[in-house]
Amino acid sequence: MKSSDIDQDLFTDSYCKVCSAQLISESQRVAHYESRKHASKVRLYYMLHPRDGGCPAKRLRSENGNDADMVDKNKCCTLCNMSFTSAVVADSHYQGKIHAKRLKLLLGEKTPLKTTATPLSSLKPPRVDTAPVVPSPYQRRDSDRYCGLCAAWFNNPLMAQQHYDGKKHKKNAARVALLEQLGTTLDMGELRGLRRNYRCTTCSVSLNSIEQYHAHLKGSKHQTNLKNK
């Protein structure tokens, strides 16, 4: 095939195969074929695909070399298939990432593997050792034989289970828990009297339950007597 036939195949009125450019109108065709970009790509194309069928030039000219068969590295980079308008542009390319990456691939060097970020969902929170919650001695179940809170004895575990789930035990447990809560606000005399009965010595009144006693302590009458005491 003649070189003219090759040129006609590469450069048609509607498509430039060297630049992979679609040419729609006459003005676009003329502007493209006369552009500097097209000329540079054509020059590089024939460097890589000589018309005489010989091997493409792959060696770069040395600093003082005069070998005409070698390619000027300041004009084009055969490795990246790029042409340059000046030595400054060429130097910028050779120091860039694209050229360095292709050079590593050519030399067979392995590119470092990218470290993948660990998903947040797979990160486990640090373990925090917390002290075990110790129940109040009045709330926990003493044994299957005896309940110290209610002073009750059991013949078997089933009877003990029924007692601990019953109203009497729960009421006594709630009463003791409330006494422990009130212990921070009452003096020892009031606390000892409360353990025997539900009587308020400040107001000289007796209540029927620990709940009523607790409500009385929060009432306005008790607060007034407490201030005037």
UniProtKB/Swiss-Prot annotation:
Q: Where are the zinc fingers (Matrin-type)?
A: 14-44, 72-106, 145-175, 198-228
Gene Ontology CC entries for this record: nucleus
User: Entry's SUPFAM superfamilies?
Assistant: beta-beta-alpha zinc fingers (SSF57667)
Places the protein is found: Nucleus
Sorted alphabetically, which InterPro entries does this protein's record hold? Matrin/U1-like-C_Znf_C2H2, ZN346_ZMAT4, Znf_C2H2_jaz, Znf_C2H2_sf, Znf_C2H2_type
Stretch forming the signal peptide: none
PANTHER family named among the record's database cross-references: ZINC FINGER MATRIN-TYPE PROTEIN 4, ZINC FINGER PROTEIN 385B-LIKE
Q: What name goes with this protein? A: Zinc finger matrin-type protein 4
Give the organism's phylogenetic lineage: Eukaryota, Metazoa, Chordata, Craniata, Vertebrata
Gene name for this UniProt entry: ZMAT4
